[in-house]
């Protein structure tokens, strides 16, 4: 199938950078900075739809499902990146948020551009991870028409999964297939067609919103503190102590000792201190509160 790139919004030329090859380094990055400043305002009108995606993500996880990101090239890498950040930040299992990139894991490091053109590959990748109706599939494609993503979303729809599409063009094809469309045109790129720039930045901002707000909704934060952070190195152990100190006002020695008693859990340690209860009682309170510290520390 022949594609007319001139009809794709992400392939349009930017009138402000027609002489890009004649600009100084400072002029180039000044123009890039000016263009980047437009991204947040381009996303703003789409916040209600992004919020709907987040509500679906929370619902899916509470029912035992997973969040599946899928995309090709930059879009795929961004999905993999966001998924990879969830376990250390929120203490969730590595298979709760999954990132799929056309061409497999090797494509994260070395581009495999041809793989994005296969509708069947999108379906097969979802079959391989055992996609079921409890999951949500979020397809990402700056152009809004990547066959790999279209194939995955169509298959997910057939199974009865919740689906969402994130693109950077008007009335995207992936948005037509998905339950919720988040089509955020950000205008022509500084370097024509290089969607790793503004389009990629917009996608990253949206993914940040989805994963962060979903995890907060699941009780992974108390106030604005990461209470389920994994302590895999000295920096994170120190952060865990700081989190308990900030949440409760205790000294570092008390925070450290309570975290040890809480078997490494910031969330349990905070509940123990603020509810003045034992480890066992704190665990029970959190279970009853579905992991939300604010509810767990309320007087019974």
Feature names for model-found ranges:
Residues 1-42, 46:
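Cofactor-/ligand-binding subdomain signature composed of acidic, glycine-rich
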Residues 214-300:
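Short, amphipathic alpha-helical interaction segments embedded in low-complexity terminal/linker regions
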Residues 45-60:
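A short, well-structured juxtamembrane/interface segment
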Residues 46, 132, 145, 250-251, ...:
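Helix N-cap / loop-to-helix initiation motif
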Residues 41, 48, 111, 232-233:
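Active-site pocket-shaping loop/turn-to-helix segments
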Residues 31-39, 99-110, 263:
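Gly-rich Lys/Arg/Thr-decorated short loops/hinges at beta-loop-alpha junctions or inter-strand turns
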């Amino acid at each position: 199938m022949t594609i007319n790139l001139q009809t794709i919004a992400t392939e349009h030329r930017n009138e402000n950078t027609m002489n890009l090859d004649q600009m100084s380094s400072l002029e180039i990055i000044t123009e890039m900075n000016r263009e980047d400043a437009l991204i947040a305002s381009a996303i703003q009108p789409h916040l209600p739809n992004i919020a709907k995606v987040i509500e679906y993500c929370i619902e899916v996880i509470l029912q035992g499902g997973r969040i599946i990101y899928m995309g090709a090239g930059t879009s795929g890498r961004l999905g993999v990146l966001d998924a990879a950040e969830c376990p250390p930040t929120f203490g969730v299992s590595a298979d709760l948020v999954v990132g799929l990139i056309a061409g497999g894991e090797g494509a994260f490091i070395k581009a495999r551009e041809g793989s994005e053109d296969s509708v069947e590959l999108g379906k097969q990748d979802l079959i391989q991870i055992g996609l079921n109706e409890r999951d949500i599939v979020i397809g990402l494609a700056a152009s809004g028409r990547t066959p790999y993503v279209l194939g995955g979303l169509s298959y997910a729809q057939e199974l009865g999964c919740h689906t969402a599409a994130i693109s950077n063009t008007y009335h995207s094809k992936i948005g037509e297939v998905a339950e919720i469309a988040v089509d955020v045109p950000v205008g022509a790129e500084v370097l024509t067609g290089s969607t790793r720039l503004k389009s990629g930045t917009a996608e990253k901002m949206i993914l940040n919103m989805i994963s962060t707000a979903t995890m907060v909704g699941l009780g992974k934060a108390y106030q604005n503190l990461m209470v389920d952070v994994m302590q895999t190195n000295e920096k994170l152990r120190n952060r865990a102590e700081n989190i308990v100190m900030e949440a409760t006002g205790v000294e570092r020695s008390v925070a450290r000792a309570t975290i040890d008693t809480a078997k490494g859990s910031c969330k349990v340690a905070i509940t123990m201190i603020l509810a003045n209860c034992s480890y066992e009682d704190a665990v029970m309170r959190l279970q009853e509160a579905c992991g939300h510290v604010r509810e767990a520390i309320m007087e019974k």
